[in-house]
Structures are given as structure tokens and as C-alpha cells.
From Swiss-Prot:
Name of the protein described by the UniProt record: Urocanate hydratase
Record InterPro entries: Urocanase, Urocanase-like, Urocanase_C, Urocanase_central_sf, Urocanase_CS, Urocanase_N, Urocanase_Rossmann-like, Urocanase_sf
Known cofactor(s): NAD(+)
Subcellular location: Cytoplasm
GO MF annotations in UniProt: urocanate hydratase activity
Pathway: Amino-acid degradation; L-histidine degradation into L-glutamate; N-formimidoyl-L-glutamate from L-histidine: step 2/3
A cellular component annotation (GO) from this entry: cytoplasm
Cofactor comment: Binds 1 NAD(+) per subunit.
Pfam families per record: Urocanase, Urocanase_C, Urocanase_N
Length: 561
């Protein structure tokens, strides 16, 4: 690890209303950058790693310092450009332009491989931004809890008559993303057994109440699961072991879970998936000394893992990929039928995307949890009829531990995002909350990503790999006046397999902010409806007509349907 990528320093975002930068529009990205590296948020903050293998917030510590300095000095009509975690320029733009534009990990397609990226990374020329690590809007595991919860609930609807009570989920991975799984299963009414190879991650999830219990052995874990499912209790159990060993063993024993998925960091075989029989320290050492051999060893273990998932699927157990590209890795190692079980988006989530419904999130820059609780109440007031959403907000308040600055996520669609943003802005203006609020989202959204093995898998018109859509999303959010906009490559599924865009907008209580919110929080989800309508989804066409979208090649939106 080059010296500049390691620093023994604790970073925490400022709280309260005293500004470090010149305005809230530059204070917000500054605080959110720092929040991504808060030790309560980031997986490895001393190496700038936020989550997802090597998903970083800045390329190295010199770049981090330069970004902080640039943001503190940035004027109201200037825009800072970030190239793979490095601040490369400040340009005069205008008041309604984004204050920061970010491009992370983007490579010309022919060279878009982990091998080439790792060479660039070693030379200090690139940075893997994951999705919300390099775009400074990660909020800890809460950021994926509701999406995972919605997935499990929909699986219960489809396979188990609408309930997961008395059922159990088998999965693996308790990192920044995977750590959401046990809590999401509990909230959905199911027991869960999550395999994790690092004890430190289990300890963190136990401490933050994302996991209820740890089993000492596989037999102990199965005994607990049997007892809790028989009693109808939703309890999450973690086991420190390697999934590539445990899943085949469960198949051999004839154990039958009720749902099977996986959220290990399989997208990154060099840093994110421990080969069977290896210790973590050995894995890290070999990643430096023999990267090719290490990647092959990891992928061989992934192949064993996927063969076990295929066996569960053949038993009739609902089995799905949760977006980490493990099927692709297994296929590259000779598992030709790796894609015989589906990804979670085509299986459970796409109808939501057709209506622009996705991971709307917001953060209280004040650091005061009461500001989030007040916005929770505002969401219930505005989206008054959605009892499912109200139930989520109640459960989130009860069970979800804030990591860093207080934040909330809830999945809402095109119909509601603009209304909620304007309401939050008014709360800031009236002093109902104590400081501005930032609104952002995961790049995993309906119109902001092209990822043929995840979000755009099995599109109706075959356009899975067309990546014009996230580029258009980023361009439109820039034109609409988002506070910062990001365009990344490789998030979630690794190099060569995705392109995706993000946006964040600040609610500072001003009329100017309201105008930007009105544009951004309509246009951003509208691109998702547009993308799915263009692909021929009737639900998306209906939503486009309801919301008055003008889509020239979709006849129904032109009064010709």
C-alpha cells in the first residue's frame, strides 16, 4: 500500500450551522466527503476505503487534502472537477451549475478490465469509486436496507403467499452492502443465516444490531435457525466461515433454505472474496505478490459457491444473484449454467423501476437525529396513503443505527421525490430543522445505470448493455442544477460490467434551491421512467402518461396511444 493511501487519521464531518466553506452548497459536499470517511461509516477509513472492496472517497491522502482545500475556497459561481478521486480543476461556471462534477474509474471499453485498472491504480492514476463511495453520498448499510427489504418482501409475495414468517434466508457477506441483509430479512419477517469470513465484520453488525446472534459452528447455526423458524421468530444469525465451504456442505447435507442469495464482494476477486482455505492476512499478502494467482483462486471458490446456489435452485429453492457479479465470475471458471438463476432486479424489482421508484435518501447536515425524525414525519404526511412506506419508516427508526451524520432512505418514485424535496427545503427555510439537508440516491436506480448482470439484466428489448442512459442521466442532472453529479464505471459488479451516474442536491431553504429541486427531483427519476418506457414496459408507459412526460418516440405520451 503506497504511503499516500494510508494515514492514521480520524475524519468526522462538522456538525451544526457554522460553515467551514463559503456556502452551504460547498459545505455540503465537504461534509459528505468527510462523512464517507467517518470510522462509524467507512470500512477502512485509514486507507480511504468506504465500502465494496476498494471503493474509495479520494485517490490518496494528498488528493483528499486538496479536495478539502478546494471546497473550502470554492466560490458560488465555480465548479470543482474530480477525476478518479483527484481534484484536477476549478472553473468559472454559474450559480445554478453543479458545484462539483465527478468522474470515477471510467475506462475506454477495450481496456475496462480489473487487470488494467489495477495497473493504473498501482501507478496512482485511477481510483475505484464504487457507487456512493467516490460520489460522497454513502450513508452506511442503511443505504441498501430498504432495497433488500423490498426484495425479500416481494420474494415472500411471489413464493410464500405473501409472508416470510417461519422461513429463512441463506446468504453470505456482512460488508458495507451485505451487512444490510440480516436486518432486512428480520424486518421482512424471516430468519437468516449469513456467512462471513471476517470476525471484525460480524462484531460490527452485532454492535449496530444488524445481526442478532453469532453461532459457534454450522451445527449450532442450523439448530438456532430450526428453533426460531419453528417458533415463528425473525432472528438473524451470523457464522464466521467461508461461503465457498459452507454452501456446498449444506447441499451435501440436504438442508433446504427458503431463499438463497449472496452479497459477498465477488465483483472484486483481488480484494473482495476470500479463497477457500486461505486466511484473510494471507489473501491480502498474496494480492500484492501474486495478483493473477490470487484472482484465480478467488474465482475458483466463487465457482464452488455458485454451483451450490445452482443446486439449491434445482431443489426448487428461490435463488437469486444480489448484484455482485458472482455468476459471471463462476462462468469464467467453467460454470456454463451460472446464469440459470436470475438477478434480483428482473426477479423482483423491475416493476418499481418502471415507475421511477428507487432509493431516495437524505442526510441531516446538522448532525441532529431530530432533524431526521421530523423529516420522517413529513414523509408520512405527504405520502399519506402508503402504509407500506409508513411501516418501513417506523421500523427504520426503531432498528436502524445511524452511521455518521443522521440519514434516512425510503424508496419513492417520480410522483413523490420532487414534492418531498420541496417540503424539506421549506422545513429548512422555516427553521423546522436546524440546518440544510442533502438529498441523493444510490446509483442503483431506475434510469441511472447500465449493468447487464444487475440493474439492466434481461431488459425486454435486449438493451441490457446500452450505456447511453446513465450518460444522459448525468448530463440532464447537470443541466438541471444538481449540487454535485457523478459518473462512474464498475460499481457493484466490477470493471467492464457497469456504468452509472449519481446526483446530490442541497435543500438550503432558499428560493433558488427550490427551483433547482423542482427540476432535479423530477428529471432524475423521470429518466428511469423514460428508459423503461423506451424498452417497451407498459407500466413505465402508463407512468409516463400519468406524469405528463414528453417522450417523442412513445406514442401514448404524444396523445397517440
Amino acid at each position: 500500500m503506497p504511503e499516500s493511501k494510508y494515514r492514521q487519521q480520524t475524519i468526522r464531518a462538522p456538525r451544526g450551522t457554522v460553515l467551514t466553506a463559503k456556502s452551504w452548497l460547498t459545505e455540503a459536499p465537504l461534509r459528505m466527503l468527510m462523512n464517507n470517511l467517518d470510522p462509524d461509516v467507512a470500512e477502512n477509513p485509514h486507507e480511504l476505503v468506504v465500502y465494496g472492496g476498494i471503493g474509495r472517497a479520494a485517490r490518496n491522502w494528498e488528493c483528499y487534502d486538496a479536495i478539502v482545500d478546494a471546497l473550502t475556497r470554492l466560490e458560488a459561481d465555480e465548479t470543482l472537477l474530480i477525476q478518479s478521486g483527484k481534484p484536477v480543476g476549478v472553473f468559472k461556471t454559474h450559480d445554478n451549475a453543479p458545484r462539483v462534477l465527478i468522474a470515477n474509474s471510467n475506462l475506454v471499453p477495450h481496456w475496462a478490465t480489473w487487470e488494467h485498472f489495477n495497473e493504473l491504480d498501482a501507478k496512482g492514476l485511477a481510483m475505484y469509486g464504487q457507487m456512493t463511495a467516490g460520489s460522497w453520498i454513502y450513508i452506511g448499510s442503511q443505504g441498501i436496507v430498504q432495497g433488500t427489504y423490498e426484495t425479500f418482501v416481494e420474494a415472500g409475495r411471489q413464493h410464500y403467499n405473501g409472508t416470510l414468517a417461519g422461513r429463512w434466508v441463506l446468504t453470505a457477506g456482512l460488508g458495507g452492502m451485505g451487512g444490510a441483509q440480516p436486518l432486512a430479512a428480520t424486518l421482512a419477517g424471516a430468519c437468516s443465516l449469513t456467512i462471513e469470513c471476517q470476525q471484525s465484520r460480524i462484531d460490527f453488525r452485532l454492535r449496530t444490531r444488524y445481526v442478532d446472534e453469532q453461532a459457534a459452528t454450522l451445527d449450532d447455526a442450523l439448530a438456532r435457525i430450526t428453533r426460531y423458524t419453528r417458533e415463528g421468530k425473525a432472528v438473524s444469525v451470523a457464522l464466521c466461515a467461508n461461503a465457498a465451504d459452507i454452501l456446498p456442505e449444506l447441499v451435501n447435507r440436504g438442508v433446504r433454505p427458503d431463499l438463497v442469495t449472496d452479497q459477498t464482494s465477488a465483483h472484486d476477486p483481488l480484494h473482495g472474496y476470500l479463497p477457500s482455505g486461505w486466511r484473510w492476512e494471507e489473501y491480502q499478502k498474496n494480492a500484492q505478490s501474486d495478483p493473477h494467482g490470487t484472482m484465480q483462486a478467488a474465482k475458483r471458490s466463487m465457482a464452488a459457491h455458485v454451483r451450490a446456489m445452482l443446486a439449491f435452485s434445482k431443489m426448487g429453492v428461490p435463488t437469486f444473484d444480489y448484484g455482485n457479479n458472482i455468476r459471471q465470475m463462476a462462468k469464467e471458471m467453467g460454470v456454463e449454467n451460472a446464469f440459470d438463476f436470475p438477478g434480483f432486479v428482473p426477479a423482483y424489482i423491475r416493476p418499481l423501476f418502471c415507475r421511477g421508484i428507487g432509493p431516495f435518501r437524505w442526510v441531516a447536515l446538522s448532525g441532529d437525529p431530530q432533524d431526521i425524525y421530523k423529516t420522517d414525519a413529513k414523509v408520512k404526511e405527504i405520502v399519506a396513503e402508503d402504509k407500506h412506506l409508513h411501516h418501513w419508516l417506523d421500523m427504520a427508526r426503531e432498528r436502524i443505527h445511524f452511521q455518521g451524520l443522521p440519514a434516512r432512505i425510503c424508496w419513492v418514485g417520480l410522483e413523490w421525490r420532487q414534492k418531498l424535496g420541496l417540503a424539506f427545503n421549506e422545513m429548512v427555510r422555516c427553521g423546522e430543522v436546524s440546518a440544510p439537508i442533502v438529498i441523493g440516491r444510490d446509483h442503483l436506480d431506475s434510469g441511472s445505470v447500465a449493468s447487464p448482470n444487475r440493474e439492466t439484466e434481461a431488459m425486454r428489448d435486449g438493451s441490457d448493455a446500452v450505456s447511453d442512459w446513465p450518460l444522459l442521466n448525468a448530463l440532464l442532472n447537470t443541466a438541471s442544477g444538481a449540487t454535485w453529479v457523478s459518473l462512474h464505471h464498475g460499481g457493484g459488479v466490477g470493471m467492464g460490467f457497469s456504468q452509472h451516474a449519481g446526483m446530490v442536491i442541497v435543500c438550503d431553504g432558499t428560493d433558488e434551491a427550490a427551483a433547482r429541486i423542482r427540476r432535479v427531483l423530477h428529471n432524475d427519476p423521470a429518466t428511469g421512467v423514460m428508459r423503461h418506457a423506451d424498452a417497451g414496459y407498459d407500466l413505465a408507459v402508463e407512468c409516463a402518461v400519468e406524469q405528463g412526460l414528453n417522450l417523442p418516440m412513445v406514442a401514448a405520451t404524444q396523445g397517440k396511444g
